[in-house]
Amino acid sequence: MAQTIDPHLQLPPHQDFAALRDEAVGFLTALDGQPWTDFNPSEPGLTLLETALTGLVDLGYRLDHDIADLLAPAAADEAWQALPDGAAALSCEPVSQHDLALALADQPALSAASLAAAPEPGAIDVWLTPRRALDDREKLAARQAAWRRFHRQRPLGLRPGRIMVRDKASLYLFPELELSAAAPAEETLAALILLWRQALQAPPVYQSAAACLAAGQSGDTVYDGPLLEQGVRQDGPAADGQALASRLIDLALGLPGVARVDSLQFSAAPAKETLSDRSDGVWSWTAPDNSYLLLESEELINWWSGAAMLKGQNFDPLHRDGQRLRVDAARLRALLAAQAAADAAAPALPPAFGRYRRLSDFPAFSPALPAQFGLSGPSPGASAQEKAGLSQLQAYLLPLEQLQANQAAQLENIRQLLELPRGDWLATLSALLAKMQASESLSRADIDAFWRAAAALPPSTLRQPVSPLPLAEDLLAADDLAAYRAAGAETALETPLSERWLDRTLRRLRHLLARFGESLPDAAQLRYRGVFGHYAAQLLASGSALPIPADALPARLAALKQALDLAGFLLDFPRLSAARGSGADIAASLHSRSGLEWRLARRLGIPLEHSPLSLGNREGLYLVEGALLPRRDGSAPPAEEAGRLYWILPSYGCRFGNDAFRRLVEQAICEETPLHLQAMVCWLDGAALNQFERLYRHWRAKWLELGGPAAPSVPGEADWRADGAPQSRRARLWDCSQMLADALAASAIIPPFDPERWLSHIGRDEIGGSFTLGYADVPVLRPATPDGKIGDASRPYVIAVSAPLPLND
């Protein structure tokens, strides 16, 4: 169908050619005594004005493209998003107990999860409510899934206590119904079962994010809390475990197709075990404690189809116009199954890809002028005076054309201004600067790699040539024409790693970060210049170095490191923001980190790696939660200690050895630590940090044994309350945790310990021997022995660690 333009369409000012033309002409004709006072519609200047306005309106039109189009990449098949989508930017890991309950209940077999404070400080007991009857295998699977999800999305300072599944309390209903004459029996009864099930069991309702947004819900509401796999859970009343006959009868009578409810009998047993008594006076039924009410809809189907009868039954359960009625049980089951399948929902919106608009394409408007202007080329018989006039006109138009061409080129830069940073240079430069932070020496290959990455920094096109340029040879001298074309054809006006590039990049990244309400300390507070000043001469000595003054390179390296920090924070913003209150998944990996660790490290430019810090001068940190330090007898830590977060950092290093920087770290820790938890900061020297890392590695391994591949078949309460045999996983965890808790409480003085007693014996019954879980112990730092030999146990081979470089501010 053909589309027409709305005659009442109101264009924005930057797209309204007629309004712009009238305004410009009115301004010119109002100039008393100036040219164009006697306005003539055939004035050639008016044509030039209209042509220039056409270019301006074209730029305005391009600016009004959808944001997705402005950010679309040039490659049509490039599956890349410029900014995080709503699901990533607005959702978060569980923060409140309500959030955690929603995440734990996000299983198809579960209706809800409720949390209760356990007797031990820092522990949370979980009750799981199924949607339907579960066998023992399904209950175990639900508990294990909840236990793993609790660890994966665990809030700081909490650990799972007992994880229990409520038992079902079956409710059998035996209603006597009169259906309306025109009501389809199976459809009416299927709708009635769904109504009663909703009232008695309150099953969760999930909708897709697209459906919620289409219904008028805001993005903040749709993506509030954790992102669930089943979709967006809708608020609704919770099941109270009670059935009231009056309520069920009202629901039935409100359904089209049900004419009358003659009786309604409750029972906790199926029909064959229930005595028929329509006048027993039971009008309510309550589920026992720690159980959930389950409507046995299959028995209802059998009851209405005649496959089930009460003891002593002498009436028909279903009739129409006084006549006995039987339903098709297979069709009724199919209708219920189809409704269950229709309840499935998608968790998030599909990504929206924009259309690449080639914003930098700007055709020069000189060739589009009428032929009488002569800019397409002078006639063969033109005089020198006529050619000079044409060249003068072209010279007048060239600045305007160049200006609009540059504006079109800068429109192409919108994507670079608004998109997240990307490219191989991020990882390459970050790794090399991390080596400098660790006071490590740079190899020739490292230096060459640095300059290659610096030369590949993403440029910005700030101007482009006017093409085509008529009469260019007549307008400019040969040398000037070559210089203009060379300068106009450049893709970037900035030297890589120049002050202008760094300043613009930092402003752009800070602006993007501010849109998320975030800001990072500046380079002066982070003391980067004092670190990189040691490497300026070595970097500039390379043959591939860029032409940068020696005294300017440390400041530019500091600005580059801050740009990398901002870029890394933006790229990881969904995780750094959503998981800022989440603990480490200690049951899944030896090296998993809490969201708070990642966030603090990103803020301060601290690289986080898996290798031990005590074997060099690398920067890093550790976080130990007091709630995860059970005592040697298996008891939980006291409430005061359970609410502590222990931060362990090296007291040496180029930056960490500086008092001002350590104060900045402690200030950031205080700002980022949740208010309900107490931060304890431990600064350790090399020897103490080495002892801590050895102890920490064993402690993490004990947690991994408890919840990893060797996890018990029934996780949760059994892991904490079963008898701790000498070689049990629980006993080793308790013993190791007690040692770590004592060390952290004793002003971070790590005493000697014997890790042999913590070695795993989880395979003793299977292979008759002991083995470790698969983690390497942290090497012990010992005094160097000049005459030692490799392999000599009494004189171990030691790698000497050089002293860290001092800050060179």
Stretches with model-predicted labels:
Residues 204-285:
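Membrane-proximal bilayer-interacting regions
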Residues 2-47, 93-230, 293-702, 732-741, ...:
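Carbohydrate-recognition loop of C-type lectin domains
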Residues 277-292, 296-299:
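Solvent-exposed, conformationally flexible loop/turn segments
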Residues 705-753:
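Extended, charge-rich low-complexity interaction segments
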Residues 33, 39-42, 46-75, 84:
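Single conserved position on a long alpha-helix in the C-terminal lobe of the eukaryotic protein kinase
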Residues 690-693, 699, 709, 727, ...:
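Polar/charged low-complexity regulatory segments
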Residues 1, 703-707, 739, 760-763, ...:
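Hydrophobic/aromatic interaction determinants used to assemble and anchor large protein complexes
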Residues 64-88, 220-235, 644-650:
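A short, surface-exposed helix-loop junction/capping segment
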